[in-house]
């Protein structure tokens, strides 16, 4: 009988998507041992099979989610499935745009792919973790792999500096999380997030508030919210560009998934407190991220500060707490996947051809490379929230949900900072479409001949076309995507209490 109960509670099928990613890690490491030539041929194929199988198993789980697995430490509900799908897709696109970059830098492809898949594994597990211990293991799996990726260009001192900064700040964030977790365990005697929430519901105290602050600090670090953002610009600038692309979407999505789960279960009785703190973080992130981005001269640093501002927009949906607000947050993260990785695809392609990251060097690019100009322009317009791009509809859903829940200040700040962001996005576009040849940068004047036949460029081309197409077809895709996000939220049991509370306030 005990063995029967254990088997029922284990529900190992919940992590089949993660199991495929794990097989991919093993496979890429094995081909890496066989030599660089073998790894270059087989590592991409193994990654595609691994991620494709993971996405397929997530799709099959959609109609039959596993509510509790591994003795209550993991939950494969529809919300977790949605976030894990976004992370898997972000990994797939990040790998597609990384093969040529990795080969040109002289780094081992099999080893690189294994570390990216390891980070993906940690991020996906974090989305469904429902126990303090499983959260920490997932968090550290993601973090350690991210540190390795940031410093992957061993010959580049900026990459080593980025890895060291990321390691130091990330270690501090992990220590803060453990300290907050120790308070929660001491107050409740349990490590299960839902059980802790039930135990502390009648125990409002200074210790509980301190635990909330510590946990929120960890969340803010993962999503790069102000004032826990200091690592972001330096790490983004120094890390390999494909790594930055993955961190900007995959790591951030995992952070938001963790935030929604722990705030809605463990701290559901402290919703006024955490919503106030989240409101402050959102306002600071939108304001500082978009204002400081105006002064950047590096494309990667500009996108780093842009990502800080984008995190603030997502927080509007979470603070609203309504079904529409949470659905809009999921939708916007899905939209952010395509428009941000589309922009990074163009940045990587330009960097491969010129070796430059300076915004000024994009001057006159339209004359030499219309494809990069068009793709980057569409993605930047979408990030700015201009119609009819996908980003416009994502922001509209977020702002409507916030306004309906009386989050007027957040919505007004969001609108103002969106206008600011449009200015620096359009400045880049204007620079690229300079008409007079003499106004083009020296880099563009000596632009190399475009050759898509080079090894590693066809996958990058596929990623670029896909991201730009999805971003540009926002008007058609926004409604079905929102319906999927709405289904994920409405069919996730632990969210219903916070939604009911938000509806009562409205």
From Swiss-Prot:
Transmembrane found in the keyword field: yes
Assembly: NDH-1 can be composed of about 15 different subunits; different subcomplexes with different compositions have been identified which probably have different functions.
Domain of life: Bacteria
Organism, scientific name: Prochlorococcus marinus (strain MIT 9215)
Topology class, membrane: Multi-pass membrane protein
GO terms for MF: NADH dehydrogenase (ubiquinone) activity; quinone binding
Subcellular location: Cellular thylakoid membrane
Catalytic activity, as annotated: a plastoquinone + NADH + (n+1) H(+)(in) = a plastoquinol + NAD(+) + n H(+)(out); a plastoquinone + NADPH + (n+1) H(+)(in) = a plastoquinol + NADP(+) + n H(+)(out)
InterPro entries: NADH-Q_OxRdtase_suN/2, ND/Mrp_TM
GO BP terms in the entry: ATP synthesis coupled electron transport; photosynthesis, light reaction
Family (UniProt): Belongs to the complex I subunit 2 family.
EC annotation from Swiss-Prot or TrEMBL: 7.1.1.-
Keywords for the protein's UniProt record, in alphabetical order: Membrane, NAD, NADP, Plastoquinone, Quinone, Thylakoid, Translocase, Transmembrane, Transmembrane helix, Transport
Record's protein name: NAD(P)H-quinone oxidoreductase subunit 2
Task of the protein: NDH-1 shuttles electrons from an unknown electron donor, via FMN and iron-sulfur (Fe-S) centers, to quinones in the respiratory and/or the photosynthetic chain. The immediate electron acceptor for the enzyme in this species is believed to be plastoquinone. Couples the redox reaction to proton translocation, and thus conserves the redox energy in a proton gradient. Cyanobacterial NDH-1 also plays a role in inorganic carbon-concentration.
Pfam families listed in its UniProt record: Proton_antipo_M
């Amino acid at each position: 009988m005990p063995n029967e109960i254990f088997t029922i509670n284990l529900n190992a099928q919940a992590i089949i998507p993660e199991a495929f990613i794990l097989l991919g890690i093993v496979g890429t490491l094995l081909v890496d041992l066989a030599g660089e030539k073998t790894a270059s041929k087989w590592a991409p194929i193994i990654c595609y099979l691994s991620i494709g199988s993971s996405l397929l198993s997530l799709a099959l789980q959609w109609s039959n989610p596993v509510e509790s697995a591994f003795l209550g430490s993991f939950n494969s509900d529809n919300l977790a499935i949605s976030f894990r799908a976004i992370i898997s897709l972000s990994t797939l696109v990040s790998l597609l745009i990384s093969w040529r970059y990795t080969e040109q830098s002289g780094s081992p492809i099999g080893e690189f792919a294994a570390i990216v898949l390891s980070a993906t594994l940690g991020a996906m597990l974090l989305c469904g973790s429902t126990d303090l211990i499983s959260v920490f293991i997932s968090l550290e799996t993601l973090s350690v792999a991210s540190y390795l990726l940031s410093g992957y260009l061993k010959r580049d001192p900026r990459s080593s500096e980025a890895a060291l900064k990321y390691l130091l700040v990330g270690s501090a964030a992990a220590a803060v999380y453990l300290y907050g977790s120790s308070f929660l365990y001491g107050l409740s005697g349990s490590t299960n997030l839902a059980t802790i929430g039930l135990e502390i519901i009648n125990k409002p105290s200074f210790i509980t508030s301190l635990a909330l602050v510590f946990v929120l600090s960890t969340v803010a670090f993962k999503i790069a919210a102000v004032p826990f953002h200091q690592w972001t610009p330096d790490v983004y600038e120094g890390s390999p560009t494909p790594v930055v692309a993955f961190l900007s979407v995959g790591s951030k999505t995992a952070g938001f998934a963790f935030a929604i789960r722990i705030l809605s279960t463990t701290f559901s009785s402290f919703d006024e407190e955490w919503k106030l703190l989240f409101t402050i973080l959102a306002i600071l992130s939108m304001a500082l991220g978009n204002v400081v981005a105006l002064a950047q001269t590096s494309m990667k640093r500009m996108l780093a500060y842009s990502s800080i501002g984008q995190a603030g927009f997502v927080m509007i949906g979470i603070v609203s707490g309504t079904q529409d607000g949470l659905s809009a947050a999921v939708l916007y993260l899905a939209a952010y996947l395509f428009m941000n990785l589309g922009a990074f695809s163009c940045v990587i392609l330009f960097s491969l051809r010129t070796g430059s990251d300076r915004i000024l060097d994009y001057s006159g690019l339209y004359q030499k490379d219309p494809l990069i100009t068009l793709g980057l322009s569409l993605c930047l317009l979408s990030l700015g929230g201009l119609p009819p791009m996908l980003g416009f509809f994502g922001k509209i859903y977020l702002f409507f949900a916030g306004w309906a829940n009386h989050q007027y200040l957040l919505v007004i700040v969001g609108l103002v900072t969106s206008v600011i962001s449009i200015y620096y996005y359009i400045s880049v576009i204007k620079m690229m479409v300079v008409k007079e040849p003499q106004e083009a940068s020296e880099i563009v004047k000596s632009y190399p001949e475009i050759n898509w036949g080079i090894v590693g460029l066809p996958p990058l081309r596929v990623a670029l076309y896909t991201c730009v197409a999805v971003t540009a077809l926002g008007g058609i895709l926004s409604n079905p995507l929102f319906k999927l996000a709405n289904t994920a939220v409405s069919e996730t049991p632990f969210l219903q209490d916070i939604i009911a509370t938000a509806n009562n306030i409205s």
